[in-house]
Amino acid sequence: MSRPDIPFPQSPVLPTMVEGTHVIEFSCHKGIGCWNACCSNIDISLTPYDVLRMKTRLGISSTEFLKDYTVPYEMDKDSIAGVKLRPVDAGTACRFIKPEGCGIYEDRPTACRYYPVALLSMRKQDEYVDRDSYAIVKEDHCKGHEVNRRITIADYRKEQGLEEYDELARGWRQLVLKKQSSGPSIGKPTLRSRQLYFMACYDIDRFREFVSAESFNKLFDLPQEEKAALLVDDVALLQFAFRFLRQVLFGEESIALNAEAAQERLAKVQEKRLIEEREAAKKRALEAESEADEGFD
């Protein structure tokens, strides 16, 4: 299984998992003794849909949001990048914290909505389907667990608006899990593939420019009606970005290539296969020679 994704991207230990039917006792509301405490020392990983919602709420481009409000981090060594919410300058508090609570509450990130629950997306190496489980986070400062309010995780997710957030980030989680479960079999990502991944997942406005470019038209045979609809709908464009990445990173073709581009791609694949076959034959010959030499010793 892969390691959990958010909010424990670096944890080597798998927390105790529970299902959506698990009942928690929890409430967070103004007036509770720990109000705003969890927002004073943040470590919040953002999903691509989080970035989309927050940049729209702030009325800025995704490029500006990434520059001013996030910091990048590696999900795994030599792997794809994630982004975390940048705290206040020279501090650890969330930049959106106010005495009355969150300043962008309606568009708050997934991790904030889930707290004190953690989403654990898993995928077995021989499966494509990801499976969601949950873990309960208990921190010393949090008084919410002392409130006698029982609710299942499934109902808590509905209450916090997480069904929409999880569904629109599922394509991204599947990409992350596929990369993590594939491991060395697909090799270390190239700089170009890491840049494409980061742009398509997080910088949706730059990705729109990328899809609008003539070079994209020359490579992909995307119907003009579909393309026009994508360019005016951030959410649809983000889902398309996940399809695009599955194709360019893992070869799962769902976007048609232009005939000339398809021929060129086929030629490159055949050339790569020929090189691999030659290398394999060379390796077998060297092994056979080594075994023959040992036989004469």
Over which residues does each language-model region extend?
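Short loop/turn segments that flank or connect secondary-structure elements
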Residues: 1-37, 44-46, 50, 56-63, ...
